[in-house]
Design a protein with these regions (language model features):
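A cross-kingdom marker for long, charged
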Residues: 347-350
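Acidic (Asp/Glu-rich) sequence patches and key acidic residues
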Residues: 1-337, 341
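Histidine-centered active-site/metal-ligand motif
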Residues: 2-3, 353-355
């Protein structure tokens, strides 16, 4: 479960985000929900599944649980390790002469029964229609006249990206307004968390009212100050980055850590930044490049939605960049180019998404 920021370009924010809702959480049964056939997947899983059961002295097989998922009293007992708050918990009991074994699932249950239990979907009797507004809302199993599985259907949105969202949230105040310009603030995140609570910030504003260049300039100045502080502390000496040290000591992570953290220049850099165990390898980047990276990233969110099309780093098809070739710098550069090309009356909205 995580939060991430999304920049929505244009009007009708709710409609633009709608194609990406997680049906299992929103419960919104709309045109974006699809019936996904899981039959082949389910059968392959069932064929390889095993069940733990008891083999009686006469060779018959017995399950620990009944058809409702409850312990069978003859094959269970109070759990002596159960905590006080769960004193009713039970555990396996193996009667004398019985043997606990793993057997193919097909030996103790039918494919229809197993599929209902595994996927949590109820069966639709032969000749009946699924109740998509009720018990079959999130999926169902179609049975033939003999009670065997015809299809196992999961109802979901394959394009799901979020289960809930809000304006601003943890990124409230992300946008810097130009002097005299107006915008709107959404709600802050948990415990009042936000991107920037200083005056002149917004979560919703027109592109022409947003001081994107000011955001970049501030980030660039701060990056230069940090880089110069590290440069002064190390006297211009470099250290070997973590990836290289780890590769040099492959298979011995403790030695790699010790060697990496013992480098005098690395120690000086961490001390200068007031974070003895922090990551400082980014300061091995040349100064001008480091500053440019900071400028570019200052206006960038995790994902972007325009004309109801979702894009994120690694999913940049409509940016004209191969998914396999996308790097952070490429994403940030294309993101900024798009923002700068927008008409000044374009609505810009920052969203806090959760998944």
């Amino acid at each position: 479960m995580s939060h991430f920021s999304v920049l929505v370009i244009g009007e009708n924010v709710e409609q633009q985000l709608a194609p990406y809702h997680e049906f299992e959480c929103t419960g919104t049964d709309d045109q974006f929900v699809q019936d996904v056939d899981l039959t082949v997947e389910a059968k392959a899983r069932f064929d390889n599944e095993t069940e733990t059961c008891l083999k009686a002295p006469d060779g018959t097989l017995h399950e620990f649980f009944d058809e409702h998922g409850n312990w069978r009293p003859e094959f269970s007992q109070p759990d002596p390790k159960a905590p006080v708050h769960d004193s009713g918990r039970r555990t396996h009991f193996i009667p004398p002469g019985y043997e606990k074994i793993d057997v193919p699932a097909a030996m103790v249950t039918t494919f229809a029964e197993w599929t209902q239990g595994w996927y949590g979907m109820k069966a639709v009797p032969f000749g009946a229609e699924p109740d998509k507004a009720g018990e079959h809302k999130y999926g169902f199993i179609l049975l033939n006249e003999a009670g065997n599985v015809l299809k196992a259907i999961k109802r979901t949105n394959p394009n799901k990206k979020w289960d809930w969202w809000e304006f601003g949230g943890r990124w409230s105040g992300f946008l810097k307004l130009k002097p005299g310009a107006s915008g709107e603030l959404g709600r802050r995140g948990l415990m009042g968390s936000c991107a920037d609570d200083s005056p002149g910030r917004a979560d919703i504003a027109r592109k022409g009212d947003i001081d994107f260049e000011g955001m970049r300039n501030k980030a660039g100045v701060q990056a230069a100050e940090r880089w110069d502080k590290v440069e002064q502390a190390t006297g211009g000496l470099l250290w070997t980055n973590w990836e290289s040290v780890r590769e040099a000591h492959k298979g011995d992570i403790d030695t790699a850590r010790n060697v990496y953290h013992a480098q005098s220049a690395k120690v000086a850099a961490c001390k200068a930044l007031g974070d003895p165990w922090g990551g400082v390898d980014e300061y091995l980047t040349p100064r001008d490049q480091y500053i440019q990276q900071a400028r570019d990233s200052s206006t960038v969110t995790y994902a972007l939605v325009k004309d109801s099309q979702w894009a994120a780093r690694g999913e940049m098809g409509w940016f004209g960049v191969s998914r396999d070739e996308v790097a952070t710098d490429d994403w940030n550069r294309k993101f900024n180019e798009l923002i700068d090309s927008l008409p000044d009356d374009t609505l810009i909205t920052v969203i806090d998404c959760h998944i």
